[in-house]
A protein has these predicted regions:
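Class I SAM-dependent methyltransferase Rossmann-like catalytic core
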Residues: 4-26
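A short acidic, Gly/Pro-enriched loop at the edge of an enzyme's catalytic core
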Residues: 102-113
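C-terminal helical/coil "lid" or tail adjacent to the Rossmann-like core of SAM-dependent
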Residues: 10, 16, 199-260
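A short SAM/SAH-binding and catalytic strip from SAM-dependent methyltransferases
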Residues: 112-125
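Conserved alpha-helix/loop element of class I SAM-dependent methyltransferases that forms part
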Residues: 23-42, 57
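Class I SAM-dependent methyltransferase SAM/SAH-binding core
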Residues: 43-45, 51-103, 128
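A short glycine-rich, Lys/Arg-flanked "PGG" loop and its adjoining helix->strand segment in the class I
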Residues: 127-142
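Conserved catalytic/acceptor-binding region of the Class I
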Residues: 144-212
Length: 274
């Protein structure tokens, strides 16, 4: 499977999905980008860059950085070029390229850093993608990989339709050749392909009455994420409309419950080339 192609990506494509991805990047920015080790990097590789939402944050955070992004979906690539190209302060600081993470078209020792975010969950052979990334990096270059661990999702009040939908969501991603639990495997994957100084950190999102504003924002984002796969799941026969309607009702109830709790955790892995 190529990197983030139309077969392995169940959220759909188009303007609504582009807007959702940009909103998602803004909401989780402080949980991902706060301490990235790219201060000394000048040529960064980003694999599976989608609509360029993470690319924009990287370029804003590191003003001396040039990012070469690789994306397999032509629609996403066009959206990234359009959005980033419309911002004069980014002129000359990025190259948005069409390519396959399984076979990167760059010579060895091209880049001095790499960033991957929410991409390995969508590919059939994440070790191969990471091996290709390592090949293109100079010795001592940092790599950061952010990935999902979908088994961690918890919602209170208890929401059986939502959990049933979530199970079908993950099962279908497996059927498409992806892995919704790849975050827990990043240490093994990075070690297998020869990276050194590997560190993994579980980054939890626990939102309750102490953070009502952020909880409300995250629940809106999470509802959009779930519904982005609705058409694909119904079409594949993985869920029925009754389950979807039940989930929507539960999510509305959770959003107005004064004691609602949302929990999810992803994994950020860091390593270096030897």
């Amino acid at each position: 499977m190529s990197t983030r192609d139309t077969k392995g990506y169940l959220h759909g494509f188009g303007e609504a999905e582009e807007a959702r991805l940009r909103r998602q990047a803004r909401i989780v920015e402080h949980r991902i980008h706060g301490t990235l080790p790219f201060r000394r990097c000048r040529r960064l590789l980003e694999v599976g860059s989608g609509v360029g939402a993470q690319t924009e944050i990287l370029l804003r955070t590191f003003p001396d950085l040039h990012v070469t992004s690789v994306e397999a979906a032509e629609g996403n690539l066009a959206a990234a070029r359009r959005h980033l190209g419309a911002q004069p302060w980014l002129n000359g600081r990025f190259d948005a390229t069409h390519g396959d993470g399984n076979a990167l078209e760059f010579p060895a020792d091209t880049f001095d850093g790499a960033f991957l975010c929410w991409i390995l969950e969508h590919v059939g052979d994440p070790a191969r993608v990471l091996s290709e990334v390592r090949r293109t990096l100079r010795p001592g270059s940092p790599v950061v990989v952010n990935e999902v661990q979908n088994a961690t999702f918890f919602l209170s009040p208890y929401s059986p339709c939502t959990l049933r939908y979530w199970g079908a969501f993950n099962d279908h991603q497996f059927a498409l050749g992806g892995d919704p639990f790849v975050g827990a495997k990043l240490g093994n994957l990075l070690q297998r392909v020869g990276f050194a100084d590997i560190e993994t950190e579980v980054r939890p999102v626990l939102l309750d009455n102490r953070h009502p504003g952020e909880r409300a924002e995250f629940l809106r984002f999470w509802t959009d994420l779930l519904l982005s796969g609705c058409e694909e799941l119904i079409g594949a026969g993985k869920v029925d409309t009754e389950t979807v309607e039940g989930m929507q009702g539960e999510l509305r109830d959770v959003a107005t419950d004064p004691d609602a709790v949302f929990f999810y955790a992803f994994v950020q892995a860091r390593a270096r080339t030897a």
